[in-house]
Amino acid sequence: MNEFVESMAQVVTGVTVVTVKDERDDVGVTVGTFTSISLDPPLVMVSLDNAGYLNELLLRHDRWAASVLSAGQKTVASRFATAGRPGARLLLAGMPHHRGELSGALIVDGGVTALEAETVKVVPAGDHTLFVAKVLGVDYVDASVLPLSRYRSRYR
C-alpha cells in the first residue's frame, strides 16, 4: 500500500476547499480530488474520505461550494486540512470570503475560481465517496492568478 501512496504522490493535483452550511455551523475541508466531469450539463465531482465529517454532511445537504485555491493561499489549504479544525467561519477569520447565494456555503475569495453545486449522485468508492454535482453557478473566475497545487505531499 505504501507503494501506491507514493505513486499517487507523484500526481500533481489542484487544491480546493469544499464547504457546506449545516444547521449549526459552516464546515469545510481541503481536497485534492475535485474535477469537471461533464460540460453539458455542467457536472463536477469531489471525492471525500468516508470517515470525514464533511462526507457525513454532504450525505445530508445537497448544496455546497468549491473554492479552487490560488498559489498564494497555502495557509487556507493548511487550515482546512488540519485534523480537529474549528468551523469554517473561524478558519476564514481575517481572510476574504463571502457566503454563496445559491448554496449558502462559504466561498473563499482570491482563488482561481469558485462555484456552487448541488449533488445529483453519490457513488461509494472504497474508503471514499464520490459526490457528482450539477453546477448551480460560477461565483468567480480569476485567470490572472496561478493555481495552488499539491505534488509529493507538499503545496506548491
Question: Where do the language-model regions lie?
Answer:
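Basic, polyanion-binding surface patches
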Residues: M1-R156
